Amino acid sequence: MGKKVVIIGGVATGMKTAARLRRRDKDSEIIVLERGPELSYGACGFPYYIGGEVKSFNSFDHTPQGAKRDSEYFRTVKGIDARIGCNVTAIDRPAKKVTYVENGEVKELAYDVLVLGTGSTPVRLPLENADAKGIHSFWFPWDVHAVEAEIKERNVTDVVIIGAGFIGM
């Protein structure tokens, strides 16, 4: 019998790890806990979409064959239990269990192997009016849609980018 693998984080690192593990190990139970509402998208490609080089936003969260990479897809196609809306609040390493909140309910999940693939979060600058209209993070799919809508609505031609990571560059 395989091991029970819990992966915290279901975007790039977490889902890639889960898929790779499944290819190498058909017997282990693989559970992914993702805090947000979306799984498996490629945020580093978002600037290419805004810039017009990538034509369809679906290319970030769909397979090349057009299937949306959501919980149902990972369960039926990959044999991975990928759960969205699960905020991990504690890790008890000696007891090998994680505590998380799903739909307001506190739950625990035991594991044999734990993988942390939580990624990062954009830094909001501690400045006055940092949340004013026209100031956006550019990390999550909904950020991209907000930026795209504002560009069209206000006919934006000039922008300032703060950040020199893969997305900012």
Each predicted region: which residue ranges?
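Glycine-/small-residue-rich active-site loops that bind phosphorylated ligands and cofactors
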Residues: 13, 38, 90, 106, ...
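Short, well-ordered alpha-helical microsegments
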Residues: 14-15, 124, 144, 169
